[in-house]
């Protein structure tokens, strides 16, 4: 996914603050409301009236669009989306969802309340946009600000008031925020491991490591929920770690690193790709990174052998899974992680046998020119099939395609 850095965007709390001037676009001020679970947002418009506000971005897959009730702060009159108005300042309220006792699902990307003055605000459904304006800043109660991402960028996710691990080195790759339960983990060591993993992933993808620190948020979630996930935002990602009875499980550090590495790939990848490619490649590179640093020796191929038959539609190929997910059947989605990661691991091994690497091959498979690498339904196009067959051998590519991708439509 593409990330465009602005001159004043120092993706770092509390160093997010950018000097405000009259040309910086609209300004969003987030303030604590009268209740702990309420935030008040004040939007100062850019330029001269008339103004028009556009709907907030919605979480992909959501069926009921969310739209806050907007009022002009000068006269308390309602403001309607997509209709011109002259009010210079508009306000609205955001209601935070209290984090469940068993922990919040990071992949749900909800706006959460952990305790008074400790919360996570996401862009989805909450931040309307001024039509025709420049990129604006979203400022938190402590005065720190972050630019509102463009529409083609990942969403804004803003943690506030959460504990943060002190930075132990110059030019860190990330800043780690976390809930209270995570204090039982060796957080400085995990933060250092993630710094090294991010550098390794950047090398694997043949991209430049982040020049400004990312924000990483770790949230515990009880294993009884049977649902642990993660989400990537704009220079920030959120990941769950497993807990039991209010304590991290022995598997928590490894799960944190793997989920965080997966989300880091989403931020490092700079070109739009089919969903199955995004998810499966991120999962494979996360597994590969853990093996590289001797944190875990599991392979994607072994995981497929152990879990493949237990998955819904385990016999389906990745092409069919991609089509079904595009049609709305997300029961095929787990195949991207398990069968998809095994596909990339097997392909990577075959490439190495032929004196090639995945890092050198990826740009030729659409990473630099995405319109040349994939068909609309997510299949490799003719040029990519020929490239892969020519690199690892026609018979090997045919066998790998048949086993993992399935027959094309």
PLM segments and residue spans:
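Bacterial N-terminal signal peptides that target proteins for export
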Residues: 1-8
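N-terminal signal peptide c-region/cleavage motif recognized by signal peptidases
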Residues: 14-19
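Non-catalytic architectural context of zinc metalloproteases
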Residues: 21-199, 203-210
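Second-shell loop/turn segments in exported
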Residues: 178-191, 243-251, 268-273, 329-333
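Extracytoplasmic/secreted envelope proteins and their assembly/folding machinery
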Residues: 191, 195-198, 261-262, 279-286, ...
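Acidic helix-start/capping segments at beta-turn-to-alpha-helix junctions
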Residues: 214-224
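Zinc-dependent metallopeptidase catalytic helix centered on the HExxH motif
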Residues: 238-311
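Active-site-proximal alpha-helical
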Residues: 281, 306-408
């Amino acid at each position: 996914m593409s990330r465009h850095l602005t001159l004043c965007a120092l993706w770092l709390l509390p160093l997010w603050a950018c000097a405000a001037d009259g040309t910086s676009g609209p300004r969003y001020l987030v303030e604590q409301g009268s209740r702990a679970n309420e935030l008040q947002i004040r939007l100062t418009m850019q330029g001269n009236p008339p103004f028009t506000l556009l709907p907030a971005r919605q979480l992909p897959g959501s069926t009921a669009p969310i739209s806050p009730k907007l009022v002009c702060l000068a006269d308390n009159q309602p403001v309607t989306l997509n209709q011109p108005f002259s009010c210079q300042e508009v306000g609205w309220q955001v209601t935070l969802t209290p984090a469940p006792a068993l922990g919040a699902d990071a992949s749900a990307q909800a706006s959460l309340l952990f305790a008074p003055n400790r919360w996570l605000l996401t862009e989805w459904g909450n931040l309307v946009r001024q039509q025709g304006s420049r990129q604006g800043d979203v400022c938190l109660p402590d005065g720190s600000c972050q630019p509102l991402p463009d529409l083609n960028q990942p969403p804004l996710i803003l943690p506030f008031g959460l504990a943060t691990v002190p930075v132990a080195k110059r030019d860190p790759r990330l800043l780690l925020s976390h809930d209270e339960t995570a204090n039982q983990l060796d957080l400085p060591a995990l933060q250092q491991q993630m710094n090294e993993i991010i550098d390794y992933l950047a090398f694997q993808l043949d991209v430049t490591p982040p020049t400004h620190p990312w924000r990483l948020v770790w949230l515990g979630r009880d294993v009884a929920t049977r649902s642990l996930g993660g989400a990537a935002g704009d220079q920030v990602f959120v990941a769950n770690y497993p807990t039991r009875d209010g304590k991290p499980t022995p598997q928590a550090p490894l799960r944190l690193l793997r989920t965080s590495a997966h989300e880091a790939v989403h931020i490092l990848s700079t070109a739009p790709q089919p969903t199955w490619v995004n998810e499966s490649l991120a999962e494979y590179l996360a597994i590969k990174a853990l093996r590289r640093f001797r944190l875990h020796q599991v392979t994607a191929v072994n995981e497929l052998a152990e879990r493949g038959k237990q998955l819904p539609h385990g016999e389906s190929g990745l092409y069919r899974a991609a089509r079904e997910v595009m049609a709305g059947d997300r029961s095929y989605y787990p195949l991207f992680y398990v069968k998809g990661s095994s596909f990339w691991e097997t392909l990577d091994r075959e490439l190495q046998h032929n004196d090639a690497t995945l890092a050198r091959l990826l740009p030729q498979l659409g990473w630099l020119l995405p319109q040349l690498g994939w068909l609309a339904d997510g299949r490799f196009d003719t040029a990519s099939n020929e490239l892969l067959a020519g690199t690892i051998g026609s018979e090997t590519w045919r066998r790998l395609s048949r086993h993992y991708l399935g027959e094309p439509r």
